[in-house]
């Protein structure tokens, strides 16, 4: 069918008469709802194949005839009024209704063109028949059988058209064929079929031929029965193999033990036979040869002992060398630390030199003692007594010249007091024992206590006090003195 625009429908009068000259139903024009169907002379095959346009002769039979020209004019007037209302309503309709309207109007346009010619022919023949055009539809189809009903009877469809006999349509015979098993297929389309029983392979069990397998070709082999029997057989085989493995291991271990015991017995027998043979040879050999052999054996033993001793001596010497290096390194570190400490305390370089000299002498004395301790006894006896006397006299002379550090208490402000030494000595003796009390300067009297705590207590107790009308000041000072030289 050809499509015609809606404007052609609205501008062209319709020559169709409706019963009672009533208003045109919009649903009738738009194709919605139930539409009365009238019989046609078309066959059902022509109705189903509606893709081709209707012939002019068929449309003449379906279009109603007009009986009166006055009625045509009245219908035209009423159609014009209805067209205005339809135009207003179609502006508000959605896209779906417009499509249906265009489809229906295209069919009506063709029918109206043919209706004019039909009216002229009918007027000539004097036939006055009023019919409403009917459009066959598939809504009249009914299903004879319930598809949900079980059974093998085919499903039929009845097509009812007014004026035509009912026609029943059945599906093709292939639709009712029994369903076949779905054959699995490979991605390339080859079906999977069962492999014959002769395709068994060694190593897959006794019943490998009876197992279900899939292969290319379609179908599936039957599933084997008697799974319990197969499982029991498998378990029996595994237990038998395990017991067989244990037996073989036991036999191997027993064979190993027997072999080891036999080898031990052979070695013992060889050693015993060798020792017996050696004793027999020693009895047969002359005494001189035996003594010479024993001497050689003793010499080798002594040589090994000497080697071990030399090795131990070398190791001991290396240890002593390492220890001497460590001692020297520690001495250097202590010397540097002592110098830094003395500088931090504000001591003079002379004091630091004296301390280092004393340390060096002490180290020298310790070294000589170690040498005498490790020296042989003969060398100790050869040391003359004169050396000892000389060393003792030199030590006595050094002790006279050597000074010692003391913590002295200085009392100042006693220049105008002649008996200041006696008075201060008496006061210090009351506090604790003293080593020395003397006038170190015209205005200073110095005291050395046996204990440093007493010197501190004296300073705290008498500093700033008045002695015989004179205010004295007490302070502490570290002095390097030789008390034998102090008057």
Swiss-Prot record:
Basic and acidic residues bias locations: 97-132, 273-338, 358-383
Positions in coiled-coil regions: none
Biased composition (Acidic residues): 54-96
Feature: compositional bias, Low complexity: 254-264, 385-395
Highest rank taxon of the organism: Eukaryota
Region spans: Disordered: 35-153, 237-345, 358-395
Compositional bias of kind Basic residues: 241-253
Protein name according to UniProt: Uncharacterized protein ZK643.5
Species this chain originates from: Caenorhabditis elegans
Lineage of the species this protein comes from: Eukaryota, Metazoa, Ecdysozoa, Nematoda, Chromadorea
